């Protein structure tokens, strides 16, 4: 049995294959997943697992250098936005690097997901609970 944090085989495999600047999406239950993208569906029921639960586990194994977030989260989900920014700040400190945060419209965000290595769907049912993580290097 794997001893590391990520026990889900699909998520572990995707993270291990990421190269510098490759992207990985963690999303809520409602984000449309492009047909061209690998879909890893973690949703069990509404809210389970939450967006933050999935993100926290993914970022224990993924080196992140940038994040893309929909601008709309600021006004439509300010509590999650604050939680997300706190997590990214803590991740920066843990990794010892600066994580660039980019905001874009939700429409452009959805288009950008087509270029990601995979889309990991959580059971989150709150608006704009989505992030595109850009892989960094550990050296």
Curated annotation (Swiss-Prot):
SUPFAM superfamilies attached to this UniProt entry: RbsD-like
Q: Which GO terms describe its molecular function?
A: D-ribose pyranase activity; intramolecular lyase activity; monosaccharide binding
The answer to whether the entry has keyword Signal is no
Where along the chain is substrate bound?
Answer: 28, 106, 128-130
Localization of this protein: Cytoplasm
InterPro entries, A to Z? D-ribose_pyranase, RbsD-like_sf, RbsD_FucU
EC numbers listed for it are 5.4.99.62
Which pathway or pathways does this protein act in?
A: Carbohydrate metabolism; D-ribose degradation; D-ribose 5-phosphate from beta-D-ribopyranose: step 1/2
Q: Name one GO biological process term.
A: D-ribose catabolic process
Q: Carries keyword Cell membrane?
A: no
Pfam families to which the protein is assigned, alphabetical: RbsD_FucU (PF05025)
Concerning its family, UniProt says: Belongs to the RbsD / FucU family. RbsD subfamily.
The protein depicted here goes by the name D-ribose pyranase
Q: Which organism is it from?
A: Klebsiella pneumoniae subsp. pneumoniae (strain ATCC 700721 / MGH 78578)
Whichever gene encodes this chain, its name is rbsD
